[in-house]
Amino acid sequence: MALNNEFEPIDATQHDIKKFRCGKPTMDEFLHRYAAKNAKLGLSKTWVLADRQPETDKAAIAAYYTLSLLSIAPEQLNNGNGLPRYPAPTTLLAQLAVASSYQGKGLGTASLLAALMQAVKTSDNGLPTYAVVLDVLDESAMAFYQQFAFFKPLDASGKRLFVPMSVLKKQFDVA
């Protein structure tokens, strides 16, 4: 195994996209059919953790995450935070998955932290956003995200979570 230390933008010519399997069909399908296409269209950007093998042309994908932009209506956010009364820009953590053969090795946490750091970098150096938002797929995903105390429910269902950029900057000690 020659697992990269860092995530890199998805590239269908370099990464074996079609062989990725994580045990969640919707997550597999997104990577197989939409990740590279959506990146080309400017709809989202997917980063992968590649596992390069000398005997193969394309690197296996150990994990991936996808970020996009999302506007949140002001009534969904706490009125006491000084935000204006129009939709707030946020970063959507749209996808996060670890290939089945790499699960149980800490890559879920590593992927989440990489995604959150990328969101902070993008917010600081490109397009400012108020928070990171994510939609929880199922109960196992909820258990995973609940390990990170900084995520808070954004809606009554509790399945849409968010964390303000200001909290992430403190968490990662970013000025």
Q: How should each PLM-predicted stretch be described?
A:
Residues 1-105, 109-175:
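Non-catalytic substrate-recognition and accessory regions of acyl/acetyltransferase enzymes
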